[in-house]
């Protein structure tokens, strides 16, 4: 299967031109696929956070924090590969770099909460968070609820927000950095958003909603 995908990718390059850099971000791809393109003279950059397979790459990027960050990839990458490890290499969208409210100081009072559990949120943690916040009966707190366009519970979540005068519903927003800058607290999942919240200096209640989020969340907590 990997061979078929590699050949298909190679055909694309033959047709459209060979790239100088090939960025690979897929849990099912390992050294076999990557070697095909390194041998063709293409620089390969692998993005990973599982450290569960061998890579044949020139550059490895893992933006997450782990207590064994410097050693967890061991012999999984070539000895001369450039290793970009840790949150200092977090992949942030341009909106975060240009947001004027980056890492603003926040007081102890919580007046605005941001809820975001990723683009799909297959466990529907968003609805559970909304229910918990409504049960608090705090009319002094404003809540921004963000979901991705692929959320299967969109209509239900939008309806729940519409029932609460201080809740605002956002779908597939390009204003995430602005919403984080305005918030006093975030409630959400781990993953990439962890480093976006950290960059914005936003205190967070984090729940792991996928297996690959558990280890990083525990290590950051510790």
What are these regions (language model features)?
Residues 100-101, 107-183:
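Donor-nucleotide binding loops and adjacent catalytic segments primarily
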Residues 47-48, 63, 86-87, 146, ...:
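Generic beta-sheet signal
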Residues 1-79:
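Active-site and donor-binding regions of nucleotide-sugar-utilizing enzymes
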Residues 56-124, 150, 155:
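A nucleotide-sugar donor-handling region in carbohydrate enzymes
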Residues 181-192:
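Acidic donor-binding loop of glycosyltransferase active sites
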Residues 16-21, 165, 183-185:
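Short acidic/histidine-rich motifs immediately flanking catalytic phosphotransfer sites
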Residues 194-222:
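Catalytic binding pocket for nucleotide-activated donors in carbohydrate/polymer assembly enzymes
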Residues 5-8, 32, 153-156, 174-178, ...:
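Short acidic active-site motifs
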